[in-house]
């Protein structure tokens, strides 16, 4: 029987009457062919939201309260589901939210995930995306637990603009301290994600370029997508890749870098002297769906094959019903075959996804 209980973090937890599985329950199965969708794309990157709670109320993201809208799974349940994905060929796992550092068991989750091995016998590439507010005290424990990389969401490099966006007083100093703690812990390359909105923070572009050089971080600008809870998005509010490159280039000449892999989402640039790096993720003006290698698992155990999907696939429901690993794997393989060819932002009839970004996971 399914039980709903309030967790110590004040989010809702889904609990199963099952023993916590050991990592050895998820052996690598080298006989599996790569996890491939019906468009020939190999899926090797899993994004897992471990909560949809967030301690920020960013103007372009949330209109509601900080608390959870969807249930969260227990740690052993995330481990079971992630392990099934890894047995199918997933090599990269990124923990997201909401704000994943609100989970008090996040370090333990990273430690357990670091024990998993890919089909080739390698360690997983473990990453985490955070707003950075709680990062200062957690950076070193996360690194020690096995986290490889971290990305911090940061939408301005001056306190007034930043706190106007987050609507949390003192947030800029907390995030800056978290970034520096992560860098000191060796969580590299350290990436900073900035969502640009015309009229909100597009005056920060040149300052972010200088920040990348001064703080030894990779700054990635992201075109604003229609994933917010409200009705803020319009094509006119999007600051495009071309505009970003032109503006930075006038202040600091840029040199484009080659992609490291075909599925890389960011167009990468360094500066004329090779010091510092920026990336631009342009899903609106230059969609990269053709090389997408990603699948998402929501905090309540639903598979989403695209950020903009109108359909969710209830993997956790099958686990709750007693499905074994073979059945779960078969369901994942079937679901991946339904992965959309591309999104349809800006086209007639486009519908926003059934969840906003904070409830899907970045």
Region annotations inferred by a language model:
Residues 2, 18, 27, 160, ...:
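Radical SAM enzyme [4Fe-4S]-AdoMet core and its adjacent flexible, acidic
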Residues 19-123:
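Conserved alpha-helical substructure of the radical SAM core
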């Amino acid at each position: 029987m399914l039980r709903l209980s309030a967790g110590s973090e004040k989010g809702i937890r889904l609990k199963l009457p099952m023993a916590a599985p050991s990592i050895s329950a998820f052996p690598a199965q080298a006989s599996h062919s790569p996890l491939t969708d019906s468009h020939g794309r190999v899926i090797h990157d899993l994004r897992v939201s471990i909560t949809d709670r967030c301690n920020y109320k960013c103007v372009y993201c949330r209109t509601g309260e900080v608390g959870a809208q969807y249930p969260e799974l227990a740690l052993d349940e995330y481990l079971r589901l992630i392990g099934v994905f890894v047995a199918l060929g997933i090599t990269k796992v990124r923990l997201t939210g909401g704000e994943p550092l609100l989970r008090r068991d996040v370090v333990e989750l990273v430690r357990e995930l670091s024990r998993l091995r890919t089909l080739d016998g390698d360690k997983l590439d473990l990453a985490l995306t955070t707003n950075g507010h709680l990062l200062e005290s957690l950076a070193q424990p996360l690194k020690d637990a096995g986290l490889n990389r971290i990305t911090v969401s940061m939408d301005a490099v001056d306190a007034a603009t930043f706190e106007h966006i987050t609507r949390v007083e003192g947030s800029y100093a907390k995030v800056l301290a978290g970034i520096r703690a992560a860098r000191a812990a060796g969580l590299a390359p350290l990436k900073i994600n900035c969502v640009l909105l015309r009229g909100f923070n597009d005056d920060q572009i040149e300052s972010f370029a200088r920040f990348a050089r001064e703080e030894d971080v990779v700054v990635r600008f992201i075109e604003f997508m229609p994933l917010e809870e409200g009705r803020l998005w319009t094509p006119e509010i999007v600051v495009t890749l071309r505009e970003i490159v032109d503006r930075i280039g006038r202040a600091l000449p840029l040199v484009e870098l080659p992609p490291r892999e075909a599925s890389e989402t960011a167009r990468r640039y360094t500066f004329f002297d090779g010091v510092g790096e920026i990336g631009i993720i342009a899903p609106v003006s230059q969609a990269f769906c053709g090389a997408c290698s990603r699948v998402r698992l929501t905090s309540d155990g639903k598979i989403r094959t695209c950020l903009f999907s109108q359909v969710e696939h209830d993997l956790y429901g099958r686990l709750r019903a007693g499905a074994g690993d073979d059945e779960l794997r078969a369901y994942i393989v079937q679901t991946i075959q339904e992965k959309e060819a591309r999104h349809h932002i800006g086209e007639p009839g486009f519908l926003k996804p059934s969840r906003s970004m904070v409830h899907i996971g970045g």
